[in-house]
């Protein structure tokens, strides 16, 4: 199956990434993707864009040459209380909100602390997707996190980049997460976590994890633009007429 949706991509606004939105649109067209999210790092990261970058995403077109563009963020989980570095009414202006642990903002601690912080983030209602929860630097109680995510309709990400250039040793955790989410009745999404446009829509290793865990296709948000957009609507984001053309994909 070809997966037409990518929820996790960084642009040159995060200065350790190397591509523009134009670059991503070009690659999306070449690869046949229909929808992707621009999710630069939240402002508490040292090289992240300013808060205003996210506020001003309203200027981004929803569609370019038939490619849908979601306005998003990969926010930073800041503490055990599940606070993130983007807040208030500004969150409502974004189409999609991802959040995860990043060492410069939340240094690795212990399993109990990581689990509490992740569950608090899930319970906050502010975050749609938890990124790279299988990172071995941040051990968690996988079953508890999967159950909380299912209860609160938050998706957990299987992050393809975790099997390539970063977060080495994630495979076992990610398989366990996929199985736990399966058992809890929750949702998964694959993210390329692209920091350069060529890797947009690259899910090769994540697909192997999904298959190993025998995760059901109908609970994988990448399966179609409609699946992701319906999920975001259920999460309280606005349904946008501009994306209606994508719902036939």
UniProtKB/Swiss-Prot annotation:
**What GO cellular-component annotations does this UniProt entry give?**
cytosol
Which InterPro entries would you find in this protein's record? Answer: Phosphatase_YcdX_put, PHP_dom, PHP_phosphatase, Pol/His_phosphatase_N, Pol/histidinol_Pase-like
Picking any one GO biological process from the record gives: bacterial-type flagellum-dependent swarming motility
Positions bound to Zn(2+) 3: 74, 102, 132
**Binding-site residues for Zn(2+) 2, renumbered to this chain:** 16, 41, 195
Can the keyword Ribosomal protein be found in this entry's annotation? no
Q: Which GO terms describe its molecular function?
A: phosphatase activity; zinc ion binding
Q: Which cofactor does it need?
A: Zn(2+)
Tell me its EC number(s), please: 3.1.3.-
Which SUPFAM superfamilies does this one have? Answer: PHP domain-like
Instruction: Quote the record's cofactor note.
Output: Binds 3 Zn(2+) ions per subunit.
At the top of the EC hierarchy, this enzyme's class is hydrolase
Pfam families assigned: PHP
**Record keywords, A-Z:** Hydrolase, Metal-binding, Zinc
- The positions annotated for binding Zn(2+) 1 are 8, 10, 74, 193
Superkingdom in the source lineage: Bacteria
Recorded family membership: Belongs to the PHP family.
**Protein name in the entry:** Probable phosphatase Swoo_1706
Q: Which organism is it from?
A: Shewanella woodyi (strain ATCC 51908 / MS32)
């Amino acid at each position: 199956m070809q997966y037409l949706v990518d929820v996790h991509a960084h642009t040159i606004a995060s200065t350790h990434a190397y591509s523009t939105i134009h670059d991503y649109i070009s690659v999306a067209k070449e690869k046949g993707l229909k929808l992707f999210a621009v999710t630069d790092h939240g402002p508490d990261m040292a090289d992240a864009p300013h808060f205003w970058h996210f506020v001003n995403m309203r200027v981004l077109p929803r569609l370019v040459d038939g490619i849908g563009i979601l306005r998003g963020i990969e926010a930073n989980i800041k503490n055990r209380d599940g606070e993130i570095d983007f807040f208030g009414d500004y969150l409502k202006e974004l189409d999609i909100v991802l959040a995860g642990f990043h060492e410069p903002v939340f240094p690795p601690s212990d399993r109990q602390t990581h689990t509490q912080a992740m569950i608090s983030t899930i319970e906050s209602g502010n975050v749609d997707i938890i990124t790279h929860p299988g990172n071995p630097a941040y051990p968690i109680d996988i079953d508890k996190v999967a159950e909380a995510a299912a209860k609160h309709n938050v998706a957990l990400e299987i992050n393809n980049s975790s099997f390539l250039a970063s977060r080495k040793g994630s495979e076992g955790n990610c398989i366990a997460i996929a199985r736990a989410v399966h058992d809890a009745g929750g949702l998964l999404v694959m993210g390329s976590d692209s920091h350069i446009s060529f890797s947009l829509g690259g899910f090769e290793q994540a697909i192997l994890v999904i298959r190993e865990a025998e995760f059901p296709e109908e609970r994988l948000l990448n399966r179609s633009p409609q699946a992701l957009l319906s999920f975001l609507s259920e999460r309280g984001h606005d349904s946008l007429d501009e994306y209606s053309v994508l719902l036939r994909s």
